[in-house]
């Protein structure tokens, strides 16, 4: 049962694969409950009765919500039976989706455990994109920008690097280049034809807040006055907007966006651009 103070609850995530799907779904839902925090217990690669028995022991010792992605029917049955026995809720995250697919497609699944993580072309595409994005982070190796799918530009602390890595995890080769007043942009940026160039923008207020937090975490507030000076930051933002207008870069406001939301917006811009080029 949930603790009487209601400050936290146990969340058991049982998977026959990596558990990434469970983690993503459960965190998205848990974020809607600000007054309680889940204590995550993640059990990946559960593929035998012996492994499941160890999981069930831990669940019984710390009762809570049980979410699972298991394909083996015997394992599913044993897990559900145990949860019912000790009176705790359990739910298959992938089961209802598979039933919907099966009803619509009129065929059964292959039952391959971890099929989404096989070493296929998509996997190697992600690895290639990650390698590219790490090499072309923060304005490095600009001679290779034409090989990117997306080039992110923006002033400091507009989430260029984390967004680049997120996109790379989706198989999108992403470079990022900082925009700094008084420093000329790489000439390669002026002549790009293949990549989509997206200019990330945030309000001066947001940039100052993020930068102050950054400096405090580094213990480096002295000597960085211009970095958080209101007029200097205003000038940076204006400089970036002028460049975006001059070169026709797509402009994306990120002030109130998470990394995931920013990446999703970039992917939509990329898809729209690709569709227009095909028409």
Curated annotation (Swiss-Prot):
A single MF term (Gene Ontology): ADP binding
Binding site for ADP: 154-161
Lineage top rank: taxon: Bacteria
Record bears the keyword Transferase: yes
Keywords: Kinase, Nucleotide-binding, Serine/threonine-protein kinase, Transferase
TM regions (residue ranges): none
EC main group: transferase
InterPro entries: Kinase-pyrophosphorylase, PPDK_reg
EC number(s) reported in the record: 2.7.11.32, 2.7.4.27
Catalytic activity, reaction form: N(tele)-phospho-L-histidyl/L-threonyl-[pyruvate, phosphate dikinase] + ADP = N(tele)-phospho-L-histidyl/O-phospho-L-threonyl-[pyruvate, phosphate dikinase] + AMP + H(+); N(tele)-phospho-L-histidyl/O-phospho-L-threonyl-[pyruvate, phosphate dikinase] + phosphate + H(+) = N(tele)-phospho-L-histidyl/L-threonyl-[pyruvate, phosphate dikinase] + diphosphate
Similarity section: Belongs to the pyruvate, phosphate/water dikinase regulatory protein family. PDRP subfamily.
Record function comment: Bifunctional serine/threonine kinase and phosphorylase involved in the regulation of the pyruvate, phosphate dikinase (PPDK) by catalyzing its phosphorylation/dephosphorylation.
Protein name: Putative pyruvate, phosphate dikinase regulatory protein
Organism: Rhodopseudomonas palustris (strain BisB18)
Lineage: Bacteria, Pseudomonadati, Pseudomonadota, Alphaproteobacteria, Hyphomicrobiales
